[in-house]
C-alpha cells in the first residue's frame, strides 16, 4: 500500500515479500523501497509477520517490516525476518523513521553490504521529530544510523527486558495489554498470536 496523503489503520501482511535484482536510479537514500505493509502519511495498528528479503545491486533501498519510510507510525509491530543485502537501511518496524511511537519488533533484522545498516526498530532515524516508547527483543542496536542534533527522541527505544512504566509510559495506554504467552506488552487490536 502506498498513500502518502492518507491514513492506514489496522492493515497487515502475513506473506513473504522479496526483491532480487538491480535497482535503478540514484545511489543514495530513498532510492528504492520495500516493506511488509507499505507507506502512508500516518499508519496505526498495522503489523507484519511475513519474511522481507531484499538483494540489490546499485541504488539505495529502505526496507522495513511495516513501512519503508515512517512519517507517523504508531502502535505497529513486526515479527517477521527483515534482511537486506546491498546498500540501504533495514529496520524491524521501518527502514527510515521520521516520527512515531509505541511500536515494537521481535523479528530478526540483518543488513549486509558496505553501505548497509540495520536497526531493531529503524534502519535510519532522520530529522528531529519524536521517536519514542518503542521496544525490541533482539540483540542489535535500536537503529543503524541516526541523523539529528539531539538525542532524547530515541532514548526510549528499549530492549524488552528493561521496560518499565517510568521509561516507556505510553506503553501502558488503552492500545496495549500484557501477554502471558509472550511475557511482554502487545497491542490489544491486531493482536500478535
Feature locations, PLM:
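Predominantly extracellular beta-rich ligand-binding scaffolds that present long acidic/polar faces
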Residues: 1-193
Amino acid at each position: 500500500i502506498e498513500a502518502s496523503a492518507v491514513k492506514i489503520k489496522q492493515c497487515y501482511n502475513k506473506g513473504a515479500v522479496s526483491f532480487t535484482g538491480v535497482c535503478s536510479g540514484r545511489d543514495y537514500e530513498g532510492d528504492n523501497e520495500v516493506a511488509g505493509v507499505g507507506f502512508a502519511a500516518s499508519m496505526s495498528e498495522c503489523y507484519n509477520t511475513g519474511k522481507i528479503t531484499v538483494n540489490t545491486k546499485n541504488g539505495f533501498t529502505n526496507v522495513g517490516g511495516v513501512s519503508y519510510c515512517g512519517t507517523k507510525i504508531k502502535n505497529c509491530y513486526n515479527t517477521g525476518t527483515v534482511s537486506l543485502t546491498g546498500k540501504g537501511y533495514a529496520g524491524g518496524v521501518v527502514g527510515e523513521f521520521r516520527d512515531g511511537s509505541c511500536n515494537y519488533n521481535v523479528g530478526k533484522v540483518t543488513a549486509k553490504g558496505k553501505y548497509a545498516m540495520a536497526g531493531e526498530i529503524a534502519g535510519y532515524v532522520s530529522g528531529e521529530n519524536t521517536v519514542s516508547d518503542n521496544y525490541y527483543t533482539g540483540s542489535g542496536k535500536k537503529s543503524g544510523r541516526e541523523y539529528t542534533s539531539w538525542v532524547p527522541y530515541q532514548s526510549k527505544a528499549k530492549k524488552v527486558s528493561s521496560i518499565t512504566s517510568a521509561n516507556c509510559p505510553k506503553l501502558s495506554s488503552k492500545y496495549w495489554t500484557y501477554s502471558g504467552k509472550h511475557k511482554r506488552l502487545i497491542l490489544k487490536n491486531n493482536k500478535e498470536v
